């Protein structure tokens, strides 16, 4: 079975961030300080290189941001500007990956929390920076709080032959383990594959203990070290896609 490893760094180290007046310096606040672009590119590349050299893990893709238009403080995060991300990708991260022999490692680009915003973000980046298409990127966004009408194609990326991924989704607000919920997610996956024409859809959390949210596919009996688990119905409906659509299959529109 082919396994594609990709990693997202939620925030750079605090010392490589800038903070507004009165803003508490933390992992969950602040913006990236572009003065540290080269050292951050080396930091990310070194991580990917270490996994390859020490464990034989080929990193398929790496992202230096997570939901870059939000730094909400509930978890680690960091604000990025659109042009700032494009400049870092083209001028620092891509050259550093290439320099260290990781030309095939893709840069997961975008990753905004709401899909429609990610579509706009990628479109703006490619319009203002045509050479970004040559940086071996994957255009990406998350699927939180996204209504069906906002599951749109990233046309600007697709026209340039850039693969499009929906890199994170779950129900982060309610808990439902029923088959009705499973069918809701089956439709959601189907819409991303057909309406948005994505090349991949990624669920947020595989196995964990949840009490008030629908973040998981396997419910464990403890948060950290568990002794048992059970499968939630959406495990089966989502699993149909990964089971019956092998890598390299092509979607043909009728």
Question: Where do the model's predicted regions map?
Answer:
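Glycine-rich active-site loop/lid that clamps phosphate-bearing ligands
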Residues: 243-249
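Substrate-binding cleft and catalytic face of glycoside hydrolase catalytic domains
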Residues: 1-123
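Structural recognition of the beta-strand scaffold that forms the well-ordered cores
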Residues: 4-8, 60-64, 106-109, 138-140, ...
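Aromatic/acidic polysaccharide-binding cleft in carbohydrate-active enzymes
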Residues: 166-239
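Noncatalytic carbohydrate-binding groove/subsite architecture in carbohydrate-active enzymes
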Residues: 49, 76-188
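Conserved small/polar residues in nucleotide/adenosyl-binding loops
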Residues: 250-254
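Flexible loop residues that form catalytic
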Residues: 67, 144, 206
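Alpha-helix termination/capping residues and helix-transition junctions
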Residues: 55-56, 129-133, 194-195
